[in-house]
Regions:
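Conserved short histidine dyad/triad with adjacent acidic residue
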Residues: 52-57
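Short alpha-helix capping/helix-loop boundary micro-motifs
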Residues: 58-63
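Sequence context surrounding c-type heme c attachment/ligation sites in exported
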Residues: 1-3, 65, 84-219
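Short, well-ordered loop/turn sites that connect or cap secondary structure elements
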Residues: 68-71
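N-terminal pre-domain segments of enzymes
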Residues: 1-51
Length: 219
């Protein structure tokens, strides 16, 4: 089991997370998810995925992220579109970060995609990627994108000297997204319940605020 191994596999494909790596189409047991509000990362776009082992569930925490079982994987791919003005832009996959729940705790690593976007290779020491894209205003942008090393990955996720996930809190997931397998939108917590990942979703009054939504109140 690549997730529970003491070492990180050299190639991302060894985890078997994706049926179609280029299109970022996951396998049946890996589900996409989104966060209501997320960290800014040099204008990159992100795709997030979750794997929870069969017959295991995440436990609700009111003031923290879900408590995920051993063998859980949180997967996040960073990319730029070639041209944000296009109806169907071509994604330029940069890296995929994995956060794995092992017996020794959460472990983080980054994988950098090859030129053909067929697979991604483990980069313990990180890497700098020179890349460019065209934004929605038609401006060409370039950046020296920095892939973090393993220590930097763990520093960002450290709390009380323990590595933990940051984003998947109930209030940050409490909104609808489109699911291609059921061909409709559904609240993410409800979908997780239907997939057997959590017990019946606890009704929460608050949803995290989307910082990009200019209609929200400042109060």
């Amino acid at each position: 089991n690549a997730i529970m191994s003491d070492n990180f596999p050299k190639m991302l494909s060894e985890y078997n997370f994706f049926n179609d790596p280029i299109a970022q189409i996951p396998t049946n047991k890996v589900i996409p998810y989104q966060l209501m509000t997320e960290l800014f990362s040099d204008y990159t776009k992100k795709k997030r995925f979750l794997y929870v082992p069969n017959n295991k569930k995440a436990v609700f925490e009111e003031d923290s992220v879900y408590q995920f079982p051993l063998g859980t994987a949180l997967i996040k791919t960073f990319y730029y579109n070639d041209d944000d003005r296009k109806a169907n832009p071509v994604p330029n996959l940069l890296e995929t970060r994995v956060l794995l729940k092992r017996k020794s705790g959460w472990k983080a690593a980054s994988y950098v995609w090859d030129m053909e976007k067929k697979d991604a290779e483990l980069k313990i020491a990180g890497k700098t990627i020179h890349t460019s894209w065209v934004n929605s205003d038609g401006e060409e942008k370039s950046v020296r994108y920095r892939v973090p090393n393993v220590n930097q990955c763990q520093e960002c996720h450290e709390s009380n000297k323990r590595v933990i996930p940051i984003g998947p809190k109930a209030r940050n997931l409490n909104f609808n997204i489109y699911y291609s397998d059921i061909e409709k939108e559904l609240n993410q917590l409800q979908y997780w319940f239907q997939m057997g990942l959590i017990d019946y979703p606890i009704v929460i009054d608050k949803t995290a605020v989307d910082w990009t939504d200019h209609t929200q109140s400042l109060d």
